[in-house]
């Protein structure tokens, strides 16, 4: 009877620390570091009139793609954001996705 009064997760049913060590040995995949496209091509000026290039950095919903996804460095991301905003203001790029 004393065994039936125990809680369902009693110490005898818990996994030991050795199980965690085995489970923690997952295969680690090599993630290639993203390099800034503008730094590689040595582009200093991001032109707001180059819609084809800017469109690659705008998601299908109309949002600007973040740095961690696009791989652009911080200075170029700031210039890219300014160029996309200028292109939106003169109606070269949409503010939102068309439904």
UniProtKB/Swiss-Prot annotation:
Disordered: annotated segments: 1-25
GO molecular function: small ribosomal subunit rRNA binding; structural constituent of ribosome
InterPro entries in the record: Ribosomal_bS18 (IPR001648), Ribosomal_bS18_sf (IPR036870)
Keyword NAD assigned: no
GO BP, sorted A to Z: translation
Top-rank taxon, per record: Bacteria
One Gene Ontology term, aspect cellular component: cytosolic small ribosomal subunit
Pfam families: Ribosomal_S18 (PF01084)
Alphabetical UniProt keywords: Ribonucleoprotein, Ribosomal protein, RNA-binding, rRNA-binding
Annotated PANTHER family: 30S RIBOSOMAL PROTEIN S18 (PTHR13479), SMALL RIBOSOMAL SUBUNIT PROTEIN BS18M (PTHR13479:SF40)
Oligomer status and interactors: Part of the 30S ribosomal subunit. Forms a tight heterodimer with protein bS6.
Record family assignment: Belongs to the bacterial ribosomal protein bS18 family.
Function recorded in the entry: Binds as a heterodimer with protein bS6 to the central domain of the 16S rRNA, where it helps stabilize the platform of the 30S subunit.
Protein name: Small ribosomal subunit protein bS18
């Amino acid at each position: 009877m004393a065994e039936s009064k125990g809680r369902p997760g009693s110490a005898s049913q818990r996994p030991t620390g050795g199980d965690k060590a085995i489970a923690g040995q997952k295969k680690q995949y090599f993630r290639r570091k993203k390099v800034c496209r503008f730094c590689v091509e040595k582009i200093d000026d991001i032109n707001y009139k180059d819609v084809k290039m800017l469109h690659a950095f705008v998601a299908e919903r109309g949002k600007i793609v973040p740095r961690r996804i696009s791989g652009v460095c911080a200075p170029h991301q700031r210039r890219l954001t300014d160029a996309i905003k200028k292109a939106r203001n003169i109606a070269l790029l949409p503010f939102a996705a068309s439904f």
